[in-house]
């Protein structure tokens, strides 16, 4: 189940950006509600969890999203970890900078799923081949599927 920060009314199909937050890399995906599909977009470098905000601003301007989705890294028992708080902080910063609604989605196993989709064994080669943006796609696709289920 996703949590919401100022969610807009879902009366029209929305364009949505999804983020797979990490301390060194942040994967980004784009999706929309017409076809309920998400696509990997890019991987941004971060320094200790601090992204290049200029790059994020460019993505916001380019895609003009209605909503932002941030993956929430939880332990398998649903308890929070260090990265959970950092991801929440990132989501709050996105909301504060861009005034867009933010929703968090449980991202457990999204990186595993991304590696399987890309048939990648090691983390280092996975980074080069877009594992973070693929994980963002998995996170965003989870949200889109939830929305489709809720509406039908």
Curated annotation (Swiss-Prot):
Hydrolase is among the record's keywords: yes
Protein keywords: Cytoplasm, Hydrolase, Nuclease, Ribosome biogenesis
Signal peptide interval: none
InterPro entries: RNaseH-like_sf (IPR012337), YqgF (IPR005227), YqgF/RNaseH-like_dom (IPR006641), YqgF/RNaseH-like_dom_sf (IPR037027)
Family: Belongs to the YqgF nuclease family.
Molecular function GO terms recorded: nuclease activity
NCBIfam families per UniProt: RNAse_H_YqgF
Keyword Cytoplasm in record: yes
Documented EC number(s): 3.1.-.-
Organism from which the protein derives: Nitrosococcus oceani (strain ATCC 19707 / BCRC 17464 / JCM 30415 / NCIMB 11848 / C-107)
Descriptive protein name: Putative pre-16S rRNA nuclease
GO terms for cellular component: cytosol
Pfam families assigned to the protein according to its UniProt record, in alphabetical order: RuvX (PF03652)
Function: Could be a nuclease involved in processing of the 5'-end of pre-16S rRNA.
HAMAP family cross-referenced by the UniProt entry: Nuclease_YqgF
Cellular localization per UniProt: Cytoplasm
Example GO BP: rRNA 5'-end processing
């Amino acid at each position: 189940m996703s949590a919401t920060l100022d969610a807009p009314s879902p009366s029209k199909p929305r364009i949505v950006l999804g983020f797979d937050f990490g301390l060194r890399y942040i994967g980004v995906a784009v999706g929309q509600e017409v076809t309920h599909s998400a696509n990997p977009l890019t991987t941004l470098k971060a320094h200790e969890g601090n992204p290049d905000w200029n790059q994020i601003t460019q993505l916001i301007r380019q895609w003009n999203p209605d909503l932002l989705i941030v993956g929430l890294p939880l332990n398998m028992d649903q308890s929070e970890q260090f990265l959970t708080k950092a991801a929440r902080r990132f989501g709050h910063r996105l909301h504060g900078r861009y005034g867009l609604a933010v929703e968090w989605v449980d991202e457990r196993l999204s990186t595993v799923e991304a590696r399987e989709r890309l048939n990648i064994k090691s983390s280092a080669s996975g980074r080069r081949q877009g594992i973070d943006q693929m994980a963002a796609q998995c996170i965003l696709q989870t949200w889109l599927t939830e929305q489709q289920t809720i509406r039908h």
